[in-house]
């Protein structure tokens, strides 16, 4: 007959469980304490983009966002404007749903490493994307571009945003002092790069298809969007579309450009200022910002001041 556990043995088990939990808690706080203030600003700032992506992907796939699915991530910030469920095929919807869950994880990972801040006001309306596309082409598209209309439109809208975060992590990494910070950014960068690669590959498969009703190819859309981001980000080429002049392709030998990179096929870097330039202004100086209507959030006053000096928020 099995011996019943005694009070003493139960107490001993409880003690060891408490010890393990307290050690884990202490280790977690030790990691947070290891992050210097200079790193905190660089880690918090990407939350603006990660929250934007999380809402954009979740609403497109599920018809609801952080407020319904992961409300604690919003930290009481305002709900996004104009975002909606997209008219997607089952295959694309499945991919975007995966992206949404990945972004929830990214937001949680950053918030568990630094204090974070309430979700900023995000404008993900069709009108906001239409303004970006009009700016990219230097004319008013008729009818206005609707990112939620179909697979191609939505993937082109996706092309606008995640790549900015990817290059932002590349730009931030050399400035980070703590190994804990660099480990976090490396993990974020790896998945953001994967998302960007999938989006580009799906669009590259249809690069020569016309986007209706505009009669403009998918490749030309990507080229125009990339040119706009280069303009807004300043400091030369940090972005290339799906089909380029051969000298701009890998090793200067090919026009197909399914992954964007420099002359050595390394990812382009962007500073936080230029990341926000690509997401808040969308060539709308001096009119209202695109996806982040109010000033981006973060704890670096000098950084926010420099962004304002660029007249991009």
UniProtKB/Swiss-Prot annotation:
Pfam families: Ferritin_2. The keyword Signal applies. GO terms for biological process: cellular response to desiccation; cellular response to salt. Residues 1-26 form the signal peptide. Induction: By desiccation (leaves) and by abscisic acid (ABA) (leaves and callus). Keywords: Signal, Stress response. PANTHER family: DESICCATION-LIKE PROTEIN. This is Desiccation-related protein PCC13-62. It comes from Craterostigma plantagineum.
């Amino acid at each position: 007959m099995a011996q019943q556990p005694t009070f003493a043995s139960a107490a001993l088990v409880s003690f060891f469980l408490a010890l393990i939990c307290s050690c884990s808690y202490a280790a977690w706080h030790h990691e947070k304490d290891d992050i210097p203030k200079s790193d905190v600003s660089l880690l918090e700032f990407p939350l603006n983009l990660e929250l934007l992506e999380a809402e954009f992907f979740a609403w497109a796939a599920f018809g609801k966002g952080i407020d319904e699915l992961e409300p604690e991530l919003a930290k009481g910030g305002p709900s996004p404007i104009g975002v909606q469920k997209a008219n997607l095929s089952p295959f694309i919807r499945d991919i975007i749903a995966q992206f949404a869950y990945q972004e929830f994880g990214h937001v949680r990972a950053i918030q568990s490493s630094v204090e974070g801040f309430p979700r900023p006001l995000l404008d993900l309306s069709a009108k906001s994307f239409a303004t970006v596309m009009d700016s990219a082409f230097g004319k008013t598209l008729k009818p206005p571009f609707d990112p939620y209309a179909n697979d191609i439109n939505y993937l082109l809208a996706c092309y606008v945003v995640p790549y900015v975060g990817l290059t932002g992590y590349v730009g931030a990494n050399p400035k980070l002092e703590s190994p804990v910070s660099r480990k976090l950014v490396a993990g974020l960068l790896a998945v953001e790069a994967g998302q960007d690669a999938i989006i580009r590959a799906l669009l590259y498969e249809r690069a020569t298809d016309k986007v209706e009703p505009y009669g403009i190819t998918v490749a030309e859309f990507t080229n125009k969007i990339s040119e706009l981001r280069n303009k807004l980000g300043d400091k030369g080429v940090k972005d290339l579309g799906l089909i380029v002049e051969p000298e701009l392709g890998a090793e200067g030998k090919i026009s197909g450009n399914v992954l964007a990179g420099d002359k050595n096929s390394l990812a382009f870097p962007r500073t936080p200022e230029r990341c926000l330039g690509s997401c808040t202004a969308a060539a709308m100086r001096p009119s209202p910002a695109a996806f982040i209507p109010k000033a981006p959030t973060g704890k670096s006053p000098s950084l926010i001041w420099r962004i304002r000096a660029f007249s991009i928020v």
